[in-house]
Amino acid sequence: MSSFDYRSRLKELSARYNPEASILVNERMQSEDHYLDTDVVRYVKRSMRAVDDDYTKRTKDAGEAVKQHLNNELINVTYEYQGSVMTNTHIKGASDIDLLVICEKFEDTEINRVRDCLKTPYGYSNIQLSRLRNYELSFSLYRGDSREDLSNLRRQIESIMISKYTICDISKAKSVRITNQHLHRDVDIVTSSWFQSLEYVLDGMPKEEKGIKIYNKNLGFAEGPDFPFLSISRINQKSSESNGRLKRMIRFLKNVRTDSQKDIQLTSFDINAICYSIPVADYAYLDYKQLVYLLWSTMYHLWYDNKLDKLKSVVGDEYVFKGKPNKIEALKALEDDVFKIHQDLN
């Protein structure tokens, strides 16, 4: 007897992946696994798949529409996206998307750390020392008011979005949320600024390593830094090395979490870290059944072998479970569900 009602789970997954009940999308989903003879196999394989391209395109189009409205009126800003849509690990056909509106008037830096390194230049290569020197020589202190710049930018974004969208929520501290009623998508518009870390300078200032700080209007200043582009780059790169298997594992865990009867409080950030921590060599050639077993084994040994305190984010700048007992219990709950699915597959 199966541990779960997979037929019911398949209906929930189908509604999530194909919320508009598109006949074409449904036919594509069905055609890929019509030969599979059990519901558990169908559930696992569908849970690992990406959302249909048509749905994902509409999500991105909603973001581009917002960008165009802002671009018509704002100056001294650039635009970037962050989140699971950018790694194609989202599990909702009607996913929302985060649009970063980045103030170009100033950039936060770690200039003091750069100068400290130059005072004691040990352990760095000649190339790195050259980068540090050039960075210090080109550095100039911003004479404006960065907090006021971000506050003004947030107010401008609110004003533009209110004028363009009937459904617009400006109450959130870190973002403005609009609903594109034509495309049936939400877009979160995030006021932010650039952050240049010491590591960014040492590595030659690659774009993906550039950080951001997010403006909190309730506090009146920017929080962070975060490194969304590095996380996106690392997940995309590592998944390409295994023909997409990393992303399949991420989607699978997110779907199992979402379909669970338990309230599993793990975020995409947490699940990304769990899957990313697995060496590519361990799964580069595994099939879907073996991937399920690997995920169960990984989560089980994380807590059983007391390794949770060591697990860091994809970027490596934050501990995921350390000092967070509720998350540890959530991991155990997810691990238990995955183990039952593994048993049902075999």
Swiss-Prot record:
Keywords: Antiviral defense, GTP-binding, Nucleotide-binding, Nucleotidyltransferase, Transferase. One of its GO terms (molecular function) is diguanylate cyclase activity. InterPro entries: NT_sf. Its EC number is 2.7.7.65. It catalyses: 2 GTP = 3',3'-c-di-GMP + 2 diphosphate. GO terms for biological process: defense response to virus. It is an enzyme of class 2 (transferase). It comes from the Bacteria. Belongs to the CD-NTase family. Cyclic nucleotide synthase (second messenger synthase) of a CBASS antivirus system. CBASS (cyclic oligonucleotide-based antiphage signaling system) provides immunity against bacteriophage. The CD-NTase protein synthesizes cyclic nucleotides in response to infection; these serve as specific second messenger signals. The signals activate a diverse range of effectors, leading to bacterial cell death and thus abortive phage infection. A type I-D(GG) CBASS system. Cyclic dinucleotide synthase that catalyzes the synthesis of c-di-GMP, has no activity with other NTP substrates. Bacteria with this enzyme do not have other c-di-GMP synthase enzymes (no GGDEF or EAL-domain containing proteins), suggesting this second messenger has been co-opted for CBASS signaling via STING activation. This is c-di-GMP synthase. It comes from Lachnospiraceae bacterium (strain RUG226). The lineage of its organism: Bacteria, Bacillati, Bacillota, Clostridia, Lachnospirales.
